[in-house]
Amino acid sequence: MRARLISYNGTTMYDLLKTIDDPADLRRLDRRQLQPLADELRAFVLDSVSKTGGHLSSNLGTVELTIALHYVFNTPNDRIVWDVGHQTYPHKILTGRRDQMHSLRQYDGISGFPRRSESEYDTFGTAHSSTSISAALGMAIGSQLNGDDRFSIAVIGDGAMTAGMAFEAMNNAGVSEDAKLLVILNDNDMSISPPVGALNRHLARLMSGRFYAAARAGVERVLSVAPPVLELARKLEEHAKGMVVPATLFEEFGFNYIGPIDGHDLDSLIPTLQNIRELRGPQFLHVVTKKGQGYKLAEADPVLYHGPGKFNPAEGIKPSTTPAKKTYTQVFGEWLCDEAERDTRVVGITPAMREGSGMVEFEKRFKDRYYDVGIAEQHAVTFAGGLATEGLKPVVAIYSTFLQRAYDQLIHDVALQNLPVVFAIDRAGLVGADGATHAGAYDLAFMRCIPNMTIMAASDENECRQMLHTALQQPNPTAVRYPRGAGTGVATVKEFTEIPLGKGEVRRRTSQPEGKRVAILAFGTMVAPSLAAAEELDATVANMRFVKPVDAALVRELAETHDYLVTVEEGCVMGGAGSACVEALMESGVIRPVLQLGLPDQFVDHGDHAKLLAQCGLDGAGIAKSIRERFLSPAADVAGHAKRVA
């Protein structure tokens, strides 16, 4: 039984799917019903994602594997950990969330990733790459220590296997001989041809069977008295299997390698998993799947359909007919190409985010200076440091949330040696539908405390371009942060202008009398809503531009000429840009009340970006409300008077 193409007409009845409220219902089905169920599930995923937006290609590729896992294993007693987690829509649908899929990634809706608080079937929260094997191994060992008999399963993609953490976990897991651990490599890199046919089914069943495992162990025990013979037997086995599968690497880690098998063929998946269920020790199953499976348009262009917005499945994704504002990612991509054209020392680095970071054109035009290092953020940062020692100008394009993974390298390998590496930090601040796992909430706080760092926050597209240019001129590590999505509509200026280091600018001045004068010190994306709030309150607004070094002279000048100071940033308040202003104020010796606004000390959920900003009080109305309540209301006057009298 193998996946079929979806014939989309929007009228699928889902007769089988609507009977599945949890995996126990699935396990009551006859095996012959599973492929029709898979067809319905795939159609449901397509229909659902087309209405909400979300990850599509990866989910179309995991339908049969998801069904097989829940059919064979006793979930949730048996644990499944999904690496990255954006391929879990079929899993969510089969585990009681079918009727909530309309709210996927929406404000107050279900998450696009596994979430422990959402379902007992989401055994471990994931969204960043390459964590699944470590988590599943911890579960397997924990179950052993607790005396529980359960399997722990990690499902990891071929891309995630490039990260060092995955191999660290496998190195640890390989010595856990009794652990009931299964690692499934979901290989959807189509440079590897899917193995199909009776021979591959036979090999997979053979290698996952008890006879094969017992015979292999028995032969090794018998031949262990003659080490040279044992070594010869091992080499013969590896050679024989190597003609069919790349087993040697994983078996060197102590895993029993099985596969590769067709990940869309339930007649291969189910008996193989049933055999594995009877084994002990670390097992490694290699399944080959296809992103976008069953939907021709996604099969043809899985990148385009990786994370689409809403679209008509019958027609596919159509180019927008209305001119869109340029995104900050596009601004970065254009800037990088322009700088590379001017200076042959400019080198671009991305940890597996070529499209997302806006480096497609750079790769085409400057292929010899483009480096996609895979999902390896730690390596990317240290690699950039090495390039800098040779007089090159490395630019690391990285999402804020992923820079967290290379913090030691940022400190030890770049900042400590004061190497001139530029960090173009995309997706800074809230990221909307991707939620807390991808929010760029912490970069200002965790970078600001590092010596030698310069940090800028862009308020519009042109400022972003000029900040990036300024960063490239610095003799030390420098970061420019900018948000996800479209900018403000400001045109970028082709000519470069270096921004004076550590200098902000006043964008609006108050006309209020003494006693009511408020100065808003805004950083990056918060300049626009701060200006909106200032119009309502008649306040001064400064575009601070630099988080480090913060413009201490401007902070002092505003403190001396205003009664109240307000700092606003789209990042965590603790240790962030506002804290830099407070420190500068303390250093100046000028005492003024300060209100720090930013992201709260909690993980902000997924949803529409504008709604989330409003929820956090970081839209124009929210900023004005907070200022009024703290400083300008009658209650604030009474409280302030009481403090002065005291």
From Swiss-Prot:
HAMAP family: DXP_synth (MF_00315)
One of the protein's GO biological processes: isopentenyl diphosphate biosynthetic process, methylerythritol 4-phosphate pathway
Cross-referenced InterPro entries: Dxylulose-5-P_synthase (IPR005477), THDP-binding (IPR029061), Transketo_C/PFOR_II (IPR009014), Transketolase-like_Pyr-bd (IPR005475), Transketolase_BS (IPR020826), Transketolase_C (IPR033248), Transketolase_CS (IPR049557)
Pathway involvement of the protein, from the record: Metabolic intermediate biosynthesis; 1-deoxy-D-xylulose 5-phosphate biosynthesis; 1-deoxy-D-xylulose 5-phosphate from D-glyceraldehyde 3-phosphate and pyruvate: step 1/1
Cofactor: Mg(2+); thiamine diphosphate
EC number(s) stated in the UniProt entry for this protein: 2.2.1.7
GO molecular function: 1-deoxy-D-xylulose-5-phosphate synthase activity; magnesium ion binding; thiamine pyrophosphate binding
Binding site for Mg(2+): D158, N188
Organism lineage string: Bacteria, Pseudomonadati, Pseudomonadota, Betaproteobacteria, Burkholderiales
Protein's name according to its UniProt entry: 1-deoxy-D-xylulose-5-phosphate synthase
A cellular component term, taken from the record's GO annotations: cytosol
Similarity-based family: Belongs to the transketolase family. DXPS subfamily.
Cofactor stoichiometry and binding remark: Binds 1 Mg(2+) ion per subunit. Binds 1 thiamine pyrophosphate per subunit.
Disulfide bonds: none
Reactions that this protein is recorded to catalyse: D-glyceraldehyde 3-phosphate + pyruvate + H(+) = 1-deoxy-D-xylulose 5-phosphate + CO2
Keywords: Isoprene biosynthesis, Magnesium, Metal-binding, Thiamine biosynthesis, Thiamine pyrophosphate, Transferase
UniProt-annotated binding residues for thiamine diphosphate: H86, A127, H128, S129, G159, A160, N188, Y295, E377
Function: Catalyzes the acyloin condensation reaction between C atoms 2 and 3 of pyruvate and glyceraldehyde 3-phosphate to yield 1-deoxy-D-xylulose-5-phosphate (DXP).
CDD domains: TPP_DXS, TPP_PYR_DXS_TK_like
PROSITE patterns with a match to the protein in the record: TRANSKETOLASE_1, TRANSKETOLASE_2
